[in-house]
Every structure is written in C-alpha cells, then in structure tokens.
Curated annotation (Swiss-Prot):
SUPFAM superfamilies: Trypsin-like serine proteases. The keyword Hydrolase applies. GO terms for molecular function: metal ion binding; serine-type endopeptidase activity. Its main location: secreted. Residues 25-244 form the Peptidase S1 domain. Binds 1 Ca(2+) ion per subunit. SMART domains: Tryp_SPc. The active site is at H64, D108, S200. It is found in: Secreted, Extracellular space. This is Trypsin V-B. Residues 16-24 form a propeptide. Keywords: Calcium, Digestion, Disulfide bond, Hydrolase, Metal-binding, Protease, Secreted, Serine protease, Signal, Zymogen. The lineage of its organism: Eukaryota, Metazoa, Chordata, Craniata, Vertebrata. One of its GO terms (biological process) is digestion.
C-alpha cells in the first residue's frame, strides 16, 4: 500500500493509508531473479508492503505499513509461488518512529525485528544504510510488487525501476506545503514511471545504499507528481539506537 492523500488522492492536508493506495512499480521492468536480495515482502494474509533487510534480524519499512500481525518473507521473486529460496519469518516487534504523523505522513519509517535471524546467502542479504543524504540527479533503484497501473492487480514477480532523485525545489513545487525535511522526491515529472499501490515500505537504493522508503504520492506516474520517499539518512541515530535497545 502507498498512502493516498486527499484532495486529489494526495491533496492538501489529510493522508490516509488504505489498501487501495498508490504504491506499485509503474513503467518499470521485471527485476532479474534474486537481483534485489535485500527486498522483503510484508505479508498479512497477502502481500501488503515491501521492506529492506538491513541486518540479519531487522527490516526497514514505512510506518504506514504497520499491521499487528506481519510475516516477513525474504528471498522472494514470484510471491505467488514457492521457488525454493524463500524464508518466512514472523515479526517479533514492530517499532514505529515516535513522531510518525499519519496526517502529514512525516517520519514515515518503521523497524521490524524478526523472531529469528534470517539465513544470509546469495538470495537473501542485507543492504547498507547511507553514509550521506541523496543528491539531486543521483540514479536509484526502486523495487516492489506494487501494481503496474493504479487500481489494477499486483504483479506476481518483483518489479524494478531506475529513477533519479529530484531537487528539493522541484519536489516542493510538485507538492506545495506538503514536503518536510524528512522527505524527498524521485522519478519523472513527465509521468509514466513511478512506484504505486503495494510498493510502500520498499527500498530506494542509490549507489548501493538504502536512501529511501516508498511513502506516498499523488496517484501513480501522473505528470508533475513524482513519488515521495522517506529520507533514511535523517534517521541513522534513531535506527542505531532502536536496534541496540531491542
């Protein structure tokens, strides 16, 4: 799920996480099998969100993806078939950022502790946290099992999208008075390529580091409305302190 904000799906003030949100890859391509080994699927009876494996026992996702009963599925490519590389591990703890605001979608970040450590291998591995914040023009990889077109069913296999980080000025112009210092935009102003429903919580990886979390947007792949992502670099202390304390 990706957050829909009304007025105009992602309008002026209110943000509502719904199961018909806007977060799956539109205009991307099928990822090479197991080429995104840090990608996880959050399952609450079915796939609801993505996430990133950052240690063998911790997953990074979006706060709006919270569900009281989550199973983390690692090593997935086709989420509707058992292919042999999967590891299904229940969540032991889900820790939302204490300042998460569901109305503004600020601080849209959550840590999930697995009940048991994942077995790391070529098909299940971790992604490093960033050393620096992303800069405009940086090419990044977004991945997920979100819908290929807004309102349609999700794909069975993992989708990828290569997209650039946009400048703060472009981001603020696209979403006046909605972008906080904890958000950044990524994508194409001409539309046609974007994350969408059920990509939420998934990774944005730039230069081998997880720089973003799929968070919200106005529809999917609309002209002038790029995707908005949680800026992971702002949360390094919180992540490190939370992991150490739990």
């Amino acid at each position: 799920m990706k957050i829909c904000i009304f007025f105009t799906l992602l309008g002026t003030v209110a943000a509502f996480p719904t199961e018909d949100n806007d977060d799956r890859i539109v205009g991307g391509y099928t990822c090479q099998e197991h080429s995104v080994p840090y990608q996880v699927s959050l399952n609450a009876g079915s796939h609801i969100c993505g996430g990133s494996l950052i240690t063998d026992q911790w997953v990074l996702s979006a706060a709006h993806c919270y569900h009281p009963q989550l199973q983390v599925r690692l090593g997935e490519h086709n989420i509707y078939e058992i292919e042999g590389a999967e590891q299904f591990i229940d969540a032991a703890k889900m820790i939302l950022h204490p300042d998460y605001d569901k109305w503004t979608v600020d601080n849209d970040i959550m840590l999930i502790k697995l009940k048991s450590p994942a077995t790391l291998n070529s098909k299940v591995s971790t992604i490093p946290l960033p050393q620096y914040c992303p800069t405009a023009g940086t090419e990044c990889l977004v991945s997920g099992w979100g819908v290929l077109k807004f309102g349609f069913e999700s794909p069975s296999v993992l989708q990828c999208l290569d997209a650039p980080v946009l400048s703060d000025s472009v981001c603020h112009k696209a979403y006046p008075r909605q972008i906080t210092n904890n958000m950044f935009c990524l994508g194409f102003l001409e539309g046609g390529k974007d994350s969408c429903q059920y990509d939420s919580g998934g990774p944005v990886v730039c230069n081998g580091e997880v720089q973003g979390i799929v968070s919200w947007g106005d529809g999917c792949a609309l002209e002038g409305k790029p995707g908005v992502y949680t800026k992971v670099c702002n949360y390094l202390n919180w992540i490190q302190q939370t992991v150490a304390a739990n």
